[in-house]
Every structure is written in structure tokens, then in C-alpha cells.
Amino acid sequence: LVPAFLHLLIYVGFLVINLEVLEFVLDGILGTHRLFAPLLGGLYTVAINVFEFLAVAVLVSCVAFLVRRNVMKVERFTKPELKGWAALDANLILVIEIILMFAILTMNATDQILAGRGDAHYLVLGPLFFSSLLQPLFEGLSSGTLVAVERFAWWFHIAGILAFAVYVTYSKHLHIFLAFPNTWYSNLKPKGEMP
């Protein structure tokens, strides 16, 4: 039951966080920053907090899965068919997901420090709970360094998603992409039904 719930958190997290990724991509194409903020007003801060909550949920779920696979040694993961490439593949995907979630939180933390310093490019959004916990790590940095960290986190997340999208097609997680078309095109008629 616990693994199913953790998988659900990861799945829902990635579906919903893709709305924020859409904004990342549009900001990159249009040369804007936080494109949806003026459109959503106060709801934007709520949305970003929801995205951050889901990012932390994904992060915690991935850490739990790493612990199950590598520390607890759950019996089904010790079988020969799940050793070698299968184990490495699963661990790579979990680590990549953790890093991508940290990139979102780092971007938001540095973004809000810059906004608080009055940088014209950055919008003060209101309190962002989870990224505010990371802000003390970055507050001593100069504004130029913060911009570099924020931009690196943004680019890393975009490049990471694109690389992940390619990698997944070669991994055991291809079902993530195929689930929707497989469900959409599935035959709903009972097997063996007479025409």
C-alpha cells in the first residue's frame, strides 16, 4: 500500500508540476519571467506553493524508493532479473527526479531572494513555504551569483526534463509515456463478445 501511495505522489506530482514547466518553457521562448503571475494574481502564489509541495512529495517518495531498493533490500528487488541494468536504471531515474525537484526549489528560493532585494526582473510572490526553507543557504551570495544560480537551476530543470524524456524511452519506465495512448486506444468491449 505504501509503495502504491508513493507512486501516486510521484505521478500526480509530475502531472501537476508540468504546468509550472509549461511556464518555464514559455518564459524561455518569450523572454518573460513568471508569465502566469499577472494572469493569476494571488492564486499564482498558491499554485507555486502547491507545485513546491508536490516537488517535496516527489523528492521524499524518491528517497523512500531508493532506501527500499538499496538499504532495506526488499526481497523482490534481490531477484536476478532486477540486478544489473534494471537496478541501475531504477536508481538513475530516482536520483534524476530528486535533482530535478531540488532544481525547482533552488530556483524559487534564489528567485525570491532577488525579488526581496528589489531586482526589477523578479516578482515578489508572497511566502513560498518549502523554497523559503532553502533561502538561508543562498542569502549570503551576491545578486550576480544568485542570478547565476537561479538561471542554472532553470536551465538545468529544462535540460534535465528533455534528457529525461529521451532517456525514459530506453528505460524500463517507458510505460510512463505509453500509459495514456494505451488507455485511450484500448478496446473496451468484453473479450469474446459476439458481434
Summary of predicted features, one role per range:
Residues L1-P195:
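Membrane-embedded alpha-helical bundles of multi-pass integral membrane proteins
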